[in-house]
Amino acid sequence: DDPYNPYKYSDDNPYYNYYXXXERPRPGSRYRPGYGTGYFQYGLPDLVPDPYYIQASTYVQKMSMYNLRCAAEENCLASTAYRADVRDYDHRVLLRFPQRVKNQGTSDFLPSRPRYSWEWHSCHQHYHSMDEFSHYDLLDASTQRRVAEGHKASFCLEDTSCDYGYHRRFACTAHTQGLSPGCYDTYNADIDCQWIDITDVKPGNYILKVSVNPSYLVPESDYSNNVVRCEIRYTGHHAYASGCTISPY
């Protein structure tokens, strides 16, 4: 996979494997450790979720089942949402939060599933290349027991943005999914399934636990920075997040 190969250019993603002539490394120049070097090619990715991004934009929202049809198809709701007596005008209470994951490793993070098995989601009109990119759980603050039915979030992996000096190479398409070193995959809180269904949760103090690559399906150089834990105070109408930190468990 040569990033300078012009035949890899894609109209679906003009940034894929594309470098402007002015930004392309000059022959004979000193390369930093990165793409195209032995250090990079034999390295490993390292995913790190952003705790401050989650803390800044966590909130509670009520939505009708009518507006949650796509999410219901992707099993993003608690089991009580699938009872036979649930109607379109019934509401669910959702704890929404964003997620931004950086690959700070030295190699691409590539989907665990081969391309031919990526799953097409007709509601959202894109392919999901991983069934378990993230786990979302809500735990009791004192007992650490799970109080809400968190779900396994499948993702469409792409380079949403990159640090200065790095370039986007992957997009949410049928053939270019992944996360490059120095780049971020970002999901805002208003996207479907960026939530935990807390309809059946009582007001109280909880822990929001967000894990990336939770089943270690993709090898990484460091698994100890894959979890964010946040303190959540839920009043029954509002949620307040604080103390979000990277956690080893």
From Swiss-Prot:
Disulfide bonds join 70-76, 123-172, 156-162, 183-193, 230-244. There is a cross-link at residues 152-187 (Lysine tyrosylquinone (Lys-Tyr)). It is found in: Secreted; Secreted, Extracellular space. The modification 2',4',5'-topaquinone is found at residue 187. One of its GO terms (cellular component) is extracellular region. Its EC number is 1.4.3.13. The keyword Disulfide bond applies. InterPro entries: Ig-like_fold, LOX-like_protein, Lysyl_oxidase, Lysyl_oxidase_CS. It catalyses: L-lysyl-[protein] + O2 + H2O = (S)-2-amino-6-oxohexanoyl-[protein] + H2O2 + NH4(+). Residues 45-249 are annotated as: Lysyl-oxidase like. Contains 1 lysine tyrosylquinone. The lysine tyrosylquinone cross-link (LTQ) is generated by condensation of the epsilon-amino group of a lysine with a topaquinone produced by oxidation of tyrosine. One of its GO terms (molecular function) is protein-lysine 6-oxidase activity. Keywords: Copper, Disulfide bond, LTQ, Metal-binding, Oxidoreductase, Secreted, Sulfation, TPQ. It is an enzyme of class 1 (oxidoreductase). Its main location: secreted. The modification Sulfotyrosine is found at residue 19. The record marks 50-51 as: Cleavage. GO terms for biological process: blood vessel morphogenesis; peptidyl-lysine oxidation. Interacts with MFAP4. Interacts (via propeptide) with EFEMP2; this interaction is strong and facilitates formation of ternary complexes with ELN during elastic fiber assembly; this interaction limits interaction of EFEMP2 with FBLN5. Belongs to the lysyl oxidase family. Responsible for the post-translational oxidative deamination of peptidyl lysine residues in precursors to fibrous collagen and elastin. Regulator of Ras expression. May play a role in tumor suppression. Plays a role in the aortic wall architecture. This is Protein-lysine 6-oxidase.
